[in-house]
Amino acid sequence: QTEAILPVHVYGRPCDVDEIEKIAAKNKLKVIYDAAHAFGVNCHCGSILNHGDLSVVSFHATKVFNTFEGGAIISKNRETKLYIDQLKNFGFVDENTVDQIGINGKMSEFNAALGLVQLKHIDKVITKRKAISDHYESQLAKIEGISCIGSIGEMKSNYSYFPILVKNSFPISRDDLYDKLKLNGIHARKYFYPLITNFPMIHDNRAFGSERFPIANRVSS
C-alpha cells in the first residue's frame, strides 16, 4: 500500500508542487521531496523547500550552495524535526536518555562554517548562473537539433544544471556529442544514466529490477 509520494526537484527546476499535493491530499499520502538540487529555488509562495511534509537537501560540493559534504532535512512539523535531531545524534533525547537507535549524522564545525560563509554569496552565485544559462540558451537556440528546457514561468530556478535534449535531427548522436565535448574540455554528463535499477546488485531483483521501469529506462537512455 502506498504511504508517500517521493517527487524529485531536478536540475534546479521544481516539480509541479500544486498538482502533487492535490494527489497527496486526495489519497491521504505524505509527500517527501528529493530536493538535492533545489536550494535557492523559489515558487509563487516562496522557497520550494516549504512544500511537502519533508524536503531533503544536499550540500555536496557539486551543489550551488554547499558545505563540501552534508545536507539538511526541512520539516514544518516540530515533532518530526525533534525526531530527526535525535536520529542524527545517536538517538539522544537528553544528556542521560537514549530512546531510539540513531547515527552520528551531525555536521562538523568546519562544514557548518563553510556553509555560513557561502550563504553570504548565494544570491550573487545564482545571479551569475542565470546570466550563463541565458547566454547558453540564446546561442543554442540557433542550432538545429538541440533543445533547451526554457522558461519555468513564475518559478525561479537556481540554475544548478543546464540540461539539453539532443534530437534525432542533430547530425550526431548524444553520446558522440558527449565525447566531442569531453575532448574539448567540456565535461557534460549523462546524469541519470545508467539507472540504479541496472546496477548488478539490483538488476536481478524481481521487485526492483530494471524491467519493471520501462519509462525510466527510456528517459534515462
Spell out what each predicted region is.
Residues E69-G70, I122:
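Short active-site oxyanion
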Residues A4-V8, R13, V17-E19, K26, ...:
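PLP-dependent aminotransferase class I/II
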Residues A36-H37, H60, E69, D85-N89, ...:
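Histidine-centered beta-alpha loop that forms part of the nucleotide-sugar donor binding/catalytic region
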Residues F68-E69, L116:
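Amphipathic alpha-helical segments within well-ordered protein domains
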Residues G71-I73, F162:
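Well-ordered beta-strand positions enriched in small/hydrophobic/aromatic, beta-favoring residues
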Residues Q1-T67, I74:
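Active-site phosphate-binding strand-loop segment of PLP-dependent enzymes
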